[in-house]
Amino acid sequence: MECDVINRILNEEDLFDCIKRKSKLTYEVNVGNVIIGGNNPIVVQSMALGGSGDANKDAHEVLELAKAGSELVRVAVNSEQAIKNIPYIRDVLVDNGFDHKMIIGCGQYEIARLVKEYPECASALGKIRINPGNIGFGNKRDKNFEDVIEFAIKYDIPIRIGVNWGSLDKYLASKLMNDNALLSNPKPDYIVLQKALVISAVTSAKRAEEIGLSKNKIVISCKTSKIQDLIPVYTVLSNVCNYPLHLGLTEAGSGIKGVVGSVAGISYLLLNGIGDTIRVSLTQQPGESRTTEVKLCQEILQSIGLKNFNAQVTSCPGCNRTNPKYFHQLVKDVNDYIADRMPVWRNTNPGAKDMVVAVMGCIVNGPGESKHANLGISLPGYGERPVAAVYQDGEKLCTLEGKNIFEQFVSIIENYVSVNYQ
């Protein structure tokens, strides 16, 4: 029996083939210099808080997100002042070296009127997001949708059709619920609503094409607040259409809850080959920067091996085999040092984003983990000789001792970066 199990492990390669790389290519949608879909890297998006009424303040909030690594930044276009600010925000981005088309206008029921009344301002947008559930009500719904699509066609602007669980088309949801109630074996309400999300998105996209918008100008999202709804909805979307998919939980929440929910849902979909662009929609903690959601997107992509942004520090939790106070401080210091240096290395040594540095607490896993990293340091455990072994590319490089181990180790890191990532 044991031999059969081992033979299966050794010979059945499909057992380990549980992560799906993207096999179905979606249409490529150009948003300025950023390409969403196809075989291109996953695009990181964010949304500015905005709404201050101060164009300069709003522009610098967008700029902060761009500097943090957001490739596209969404702003709410919900008033005359908001849309009038768009050209100024664009100019601030351009003056700081960013693409002139990285701003996404997020419109709800007022977007049709605003793009019609202020076309010179709206044309500065790189993409427009519209919500089929509230772009208009009654007999205005279809007309408003058509007006925005025609504007997008005229100014060559891509559209994201963003369907949300909390603002789902009431007419469509009601019809599907009523039809379901007449069945001899009705489906649960949540399944009917999942179907309504997908139908709303796909039929809206097809309607946009009928009006004249090219299929490579359309991105789709169907956001829910629960992972167990998000996954089936996007799985079906991926099966029934070729539009690029924008992933994210809506109303994810704040703190650990929002982080865990977003990471769980987005990571699952990406590891199953679904998704072209992502946003983590966190409720900010008081005083927290909006750039947190950008960093989380980057960490998701880096953690699952899709895209590197920063040198990675691997470390154990520490235990009573080592001096936890000293070890935890060393891990923090190395992390802080690399975070401070990455903005410089991106310009002078861009390959440093692929570097892995291991900081380990003792001999149990320290040498092994350090050998798997580009650079690694393994501290001595209690009762061991007070020296720290350093490994480089799998080989022992030297041992460090004394009170300035951190300074010695970062000197080794700097030398490695300058030699290997020129």
From Swiss-Prot:
One of its GO terms (biological process) is isopentenyl diphosphate biosynthetic process, methylerythritol 4-phosphate pathway. Converts 2C-methyl-D-erythritol 2,4-cyclodiphosphate (ME-2,4cPP) into 1-hydroxy-2-methyl-2-(E)-butenyl 4-diphosphate. PANTHER family: 4-HYDROXY-3-METHYLBUT-2-EN-1-YL DIPHOSPHATE SYNTHASE (PTHR30454), 4-HYDROXY-3-METHYLBUT-2-EN-1-YL DIPHOSPHATE SYNTHASE (FERREDOXIN), CHLOROPLASTIC (PTHR30454:SF0). The keyword Iron applies. Pfam families: GcpE. It comes from Ehrlichia canis (strain Jake). It comes from the Bacteria. Pathway: Isoprenoid biosynthesis; isopentenyl diphosphate biosynthesis via DXP pathway; isopentenyl diphosphate from 1-deoxy-D-xylulose 5-phosphate: step 5/6. Its EC number is 1.17.7.3. It catalyses: (2E)-4-hydroxy-3-methylbut-2-enyl diphosphate + oxidized [flavodoxin] + H2O + 2 H(+) = 2-C-methyl-D-erythritol 2,4-cyclic diphosphate + reduced [flavodoxin]. [4Fe-4S] cluster binds at C316, C319, C362, E369. Its cofactor is [4Fe-4S] cluster. Belongs to the IspG family. Keywords: 4Fe-4S, Iron, Iron-sulfur, Isoprene biosynthesis, Metal-binding, Oxidoreductase. Binds 1 [4Fe-4S] cluster. GO terms for molecular function: 4 iron, 4 sulfur cluster binding; 4-hydroxy-3-methylbut-2-en-1-yl diphosphate synthase activity (ferredoxin); 4-hydroxy-3-methylbut-2-enyl-diphosphate synthase activity (flavodoxin); iron ion binding. This is 4-hydroxy-3-methylbut-2-en-1-yl diphosphate synthase (flavodoxin). It is an enzyme of class 1 (oxidoreductase). InterPro entries: Dihydropteroate_synth-like_sf, IspG_bac, IspG_bac-typ, NO2/SO3_Rdtase_4Fe4S_sf. The keyword Metal-binding applies.
